[in-house]
Amino acid sequence: MIYPLSIRSFFCSRVITAVLLALLFTGCSENSAPDTETQNREITMNELAERYVKLTLAVGQHHDYYIDAYYGPEAWREQDKQPLGELLQLGENLHADLAKIDATNHEKSRHEFLTIQTESVLFFIKHLQGEQFSFDEESKALYDAISPTIDESEFDQALAELDDLLPGDGPLNQRMAVFSKQFEIPKDKLDTVFRAAIKESRQRTRQFIDLPTQENFTLEYVTDKVWSGYNWYKGNSFSLIQMNTDFPITIDRAIDLASHEGYPGHHVFNSLMEKHLVNANGWIEYSVYPLFSPMSLLAEGSANYGIDVAFPEHERIAFEKEVLFPLAGLDSSKVDLYYAVQAVRSKLSYIDNVVAKRYLDGQIDKQTAQQMLMKYALSSEQKALQRIGFIEQNRAYVINYNLGQDIVRDYVEQLSKGNAEKRWQVFSELLAYPKTASMMRH
């Protein structure tokens, strides 16, 4: 407390007296035994976890989208807004105390994960304070990974393949738009197709993963978003899944979104963490999900890779041709060419990272970024602008989809060694007991 100048003199003599008394008793206290309860008591992981949750919730008061999900004590959310400087100090204290912990084998992974998550919180606070960082510095600090450097010549090779598959006049992105139009799901069939895709992905996931009996979701259709789909996890194994209908949705996106947002993607990931870590183990730090953190690389990477786990290529093609195409009222006569085109397009996925890095690092302007997305992502003008909006809002987060998928795939495939049942086992264990990118690469 800072006292007003007008009453300062009132306390002068008392302050001097207090100082003298403190000096008088210093010799008596120097060699006295410390209170073991308050001074030497070991800090527990659960105490540090509670501090971490409260810290991330407090940071969330400074950014509308930082807290993606929270289902811990409601009272912890209802705290006064604290200055960023104070939060940075709290975070640094937490990080220092984590470094003092000698984690047992049982809690070693828990300790490592919480430490890396805490480091990302510290970085995000500095970002909110206005500190400037490069794209790679941001992705490393927030997501524990750096996207590889890819030469544009690699993308050009994929474009040449697509040019052969889709011959004709005009820019390639326009030819792609014309070709893809015949595979767009009519708006009045969207709900039917999506629910069929979700039902199938749910059944396939349940064969290998023991989901909570009460797990469920609500499906909504929205507009005017920078994303194509979103899972809002509410706790108790319940999700609100939203699909953005701003742009036409092609038939292949039904399984993509059903699996990514639902099964075995985000909905399953959050449900398993809540079931095994929060409810069974009492590890409260997993009750909060800060969006801009290493957890998101696993979340997005596993949601993308999970599509292939649930739907191996030949099974996916069969289900789409036999079930989804008829439900959408689409002609499947050119489906083989469509899948060939999609396979080549997948080689272009890292263009998002290249464009985001150059744009956010100030190497290119918005117009150039749009042109690059139109050329290499084969986007329309409007779709390219939507993607730039996503990049502006979420910045280095874009690496989590492609790089995250590759890191998760490498981890799971290395341990499962091509065995389909083992793949499900390793994959589900990774969702239930999360690892950051560097932990997966150990």
Sequence positions of predicted segments:
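N-terminal secretory signal peptides that target proteins for export/translocation
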Residues: 1-12
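Generic secretory/membrane-interface signal
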Residues: 11, 24-25, 294
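N-terminal maturation segment of proteins
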Residues: 28-442
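Bacterial N-terminal signal peptides
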Residues: 15-26
